[in-house]
Amino acid sequence: MAAVAVAVREESRSEMKTELSPRPGAAGRELTQEEKLQLRKEKKQQKKKRKEEKGADQEIGSAVSAAQRQDPIRELPGPGSQLGGTAGEKLPAGRSKAELRAERRAKQEAERALKQARKGEQGGVPPQACPSTAGETTSGVKRVPEHTPADDPTLLRRLLRKPDRQQVPTRKDYGSKVSLFSHLPQYSRQSSLTQYMSIPSSVIHPAMVRLGLQYSQGLISGSNARCIALLHALQQVIQDYTTPPSEELSRDLVNKLKPYISFLTQCRPMSASMCNAIKFLTKEVTGMSSSKREEEAKSELREALDRYVQEKIVLAAQAISRFASTKISDGDVILVYGCSSLVSRILQEARVEGRRFRVVVVDSRPRLEGRHMLHSLVRAGVPTSYLLIPAASYVLPEVSKVLLGAHALLANGSVMSRVGTAQLALVARAHNVPVLVCCETYKFCERVQTDAFVSNELDDPDDLQCKRGDQVALANWQSHPSLRLLNLVYDVTPPELVDLVITELGMIPCSSVPVVLRVKSSDQ
């Protein structure tokens, strides 16, 4: 390469000297003005020609270095050879940049095709016959795969190894599932998780067994209720815990809690509020000093859990109620959905303050949680109407605002709540009705989700059976192979459909959720 460049430069200098030498007949006399101008013009042309040749040398050098990086085993051209030519050829000085670039591109394409052919020979499959990646066709259009990775039997067996190692019973899927949600577990309340479980010999604490059964049977529902029940059960576990000899509480207690959490997950998937509470307890346990006595450490952990309930749930609800009451005016018609303990408290306290408003409770099958909200509001003396979600669009023209609860607030600002919330928010946006979401910050999670397909919860499909007297609709639905029931628990509402989020920190937009998460992580 260097020899080629030197040869080109020497040839250019010799041509320049030849052209700049005095012409015949010009020796012995002084050059005229025209001859001087002609000589200067020739010098400029030679200088321009040298610059072009220098640029061509640099491009050739970059091409050689690129070829070395792509195929270091390949033999580089010798001193007498030229890139892309046979030995003994010299680089023509009259080549333009475009021609050199085209030649270099053609050579790179040829080398790339040669490499692919070599790889095909080594793998035994020609490059044209190589199978495309999952979800991608030969035309380059990506398609959604028919089966998700969670459907893989190998992966399912791997996931079941963890409960087996922890001596935790597992539940089997029940019924046929809709293909879009085939990666989610679907359980039946008829099959008890503790049916073949021996309580005395089990590693699961009795308080956790009782709590798991209450979760699976739907006796405890709602994010706040489930989290409070979990923290109370953990207090009993800590109270009965004894540190083994030659062990530290900060390490052994965390290992003891792992099978308990796995058991609760088998009973019902954990909510975002429960996950945050477990993270808080784990942080408190691991940060416990080893010099403290066992009773003192256990007492501090129980007090920390009580403080967590008081600050994150009770006091947070009081602050949210104060902020939300400023948005309720006399004569308002407020639409609520389902039964949210926080929304119910806000409305009852606003009634106690003397606000005159009316509430429309929207409910949906199969849970019909709105009936509990209806009973609590009627007892508080709030004028209330009750209807099912298909009729919501008929009452929205007279509604002044929509007040909703939340299961979790995701990092991208999406609201995860009971299924049907996104539908109500969309209809409210069509009628220009503001949507207000009330949510404590301990329900904020760092998970990002834009739809309800990837991560969700499937409830018992038998709940969709409708009983009217002695007749049961959808009875023996499993005997029909083409029939599948979907009892979805949550949906995801995009942040564009939510006007305001009311928290104990104040009233914020959905776009401020990452800021709250960042502040919480820095405080911890």
From Swiss-Prot:
Activated by the chemical integrated stress response (ISR) inhibitor ISRIB which stimulates guanine nucleotide exchange factor activity for both phosphorylated and unphosphorylated eIF2. It comes from the Eukaryota. Residues 130-140 have a biased composition (Polar residues). The keyword Phosphoprotein applies. Residues 171-180 are annotated as: May bind the chemical integrated stress response (ISR) inhibitor ISRIB. One of its GO terms (biological process) is T cell receptor signaling pathway. One of its GO terms (cellular component) is eukaryotic translation initiation factor 2B complex. Keywords: Acetylation, Cytoplasm, Initiation factor, Phosphoprotein, Protein biosynthesis. Residues 1-155 are annotated as: Disordered. Residues 8-20, 31-40, 96-121 have a biased composition (Basic and acidic residues). It is found in: Cytoplasm, Cytosol. Gene3D superfamilies: Translation initiation factor eif-2b, domain 2. Component of the translation initiation factor 2B (eIF2B) complex which is a heterodecamer of two sets of five different subunits: alpha, beta, gamma, delta and epsilon. Subunits alpha, beta and delta comprise a regulatory subcomplex and subunits epsilon and gamma comprise a catalytic subcomplex. Within the complex, the hexameric regulatory complex resides at the center, with the two heterodimeric catalytic subcomplexes bound on opposite sides. Acts as a component of the translation initiation factor 2B (eIF2B) complex, which catalyzes the exchange of GDP for GTP on eukaryotic initiation factor 2 (eIF2) gamma subunit. Its guanine nucleotide exchange factor activity is repressed when bound to eIF2 complex phosphorylated on the alpha subunit, thereby limiting the amount of methionyl-initiator methionine tRNA available to the ribosome and consequently global translation is repressed. This is Translation initiation factor eIF2B subunit delta.
